C-alpha cells in the first residue's frame, strides 16, 4: 500500500497542489491521512532507524527478556542455565523482522500516523526552485525540534510538541507539520489555515532545510543536477586555487 501511495497518488497530489491557487487549503483530511502513512513508513524503514533499534533499543529489550526468562525457571535450574540464557542473541535479520512486525502492526502504525495527522499542516511551494530546489536523501523526512535545533526522530520523538516534520514531495513542493500543541499548531487550527498552500521565497529558509536534510542523511543525499554542477564547479575552483 505504501509503495502505491508513493507512485500515482503522489503524482496526482503534486499536480493538484501545483494547479491550485496561492493561500488556499490544498490538503484534504484524506490527503493528510495518506501522507501520514507515507511519512511514518519513511521514518521507520530508513537505515538510521534500524541502526538505532539495533544499537540502542534492542540491547535493553533483550536484557529484560533474558532476566524475565531466568526468573521464570525453577530455582534449581537458575544457576545452571543463567549464563547460557544471558548469552542468547537474535540474529540481525530477526532483530529487523521483530522491529517491523511491531512497528507496522495496524494498531501501532495507525497510532504513529494519528500523531502527525492531527497536527497543523502547511504546503510550501518553493519560489527559489530554479536555482535552489528542495533536496532529499535516503532519510527523507526531516525531524527537528523547534528551539534546540536537534534533528532525527530518536532525538525528538513524534509526540513532542516541539517536534516539526519537513518532507519534500518534489524539488518545488514540501509539506511541513507542526504539533497541534505547539504555538504554530494552535494558531493554525484557530485561524483555519491547516492544510494551507504558501509560497516560500526566502532563500535562507530553503538552504537551512537543505543543509539539515544533508546532515540527517544516512549515506546519500539527492541533489538536482544543476545544483550538483554548481557545487562541483565550486569544489574544482577551490581545488585549483589551493594548488596555485
Question: What spans do the regions from the language model cover?
Answer:
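Alpha-helical structural context detector biased toward long hydrophobic helices
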Residues: 1-244
Amino acid at each position: 500500500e505504501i509503495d502505491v501511495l508513493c507512485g500515482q497518488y503522489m503524482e496526482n497530489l503534486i499536480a493538484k497542489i501545483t494547479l491550485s491557487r496561492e493561500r488556499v487549503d490544498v490538503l484534504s483530511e484524506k490527503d493528510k491521512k495518506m501522507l501520514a502513512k507515507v511519512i511514518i513508513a519513511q521514518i521507520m524503514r530508513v537505515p538510521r532507524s534500524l541502526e538505532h533499534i539495533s544499537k540502542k533499543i534492542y540491547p535493553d529489550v533483550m536484557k529484560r527478556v533474558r532476566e524475565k526468562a531466568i526468573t521464570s525457571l525453577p530455582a534449581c535450574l537458575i544457576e545452571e542455565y543463567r549464563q547460557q540464557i544471558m548469552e542468547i542473541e537474535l540474529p540481525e535479520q530477526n532483530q529487523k523482522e521483530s522491529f517491523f512486525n511491531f512497528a507496522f502492526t495496524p494498531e501501532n502504525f495507525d497510532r504513529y500516523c494519528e500523531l502527525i495527522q492531527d497536527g497543523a499542516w502547511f504546503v510550501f511551494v518553493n519560489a527559489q526552485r530554479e536555482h535552489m530546489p528542495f533536496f532529499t536523501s535516503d532519510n527523507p523526512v526531516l525531524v527537528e525540534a523547534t528551539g534546540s535545533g536537534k534533528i532525527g526522530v530518536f532525538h525528538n520523538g513524534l509526540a513532542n510538541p516541539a517536534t516539526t516534520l519537513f518532507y519534500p514531495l518534489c524539488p518545488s513542493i514540501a509539506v511541513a507539520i507542526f504539533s497541534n500543541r505547539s504555538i504554530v499548531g494552535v494558531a493554525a487550527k484557530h485561524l483555519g489555515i491547516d492544510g494551507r498552500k504558501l509560497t516560500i521565497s526566502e532563500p535562507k529558509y530553503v538552504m537551512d532545510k537543505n543543509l539539515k536534510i544533508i546532515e540527517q542523511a544516512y549515506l546519500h543525499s539527492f541533489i538536482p543536477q544543476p545544483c550538483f554542477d554548481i557545487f562541483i564547479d565550486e569544489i574544482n575552483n577551490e581545488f585549483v586555487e589551493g594548488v596555485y
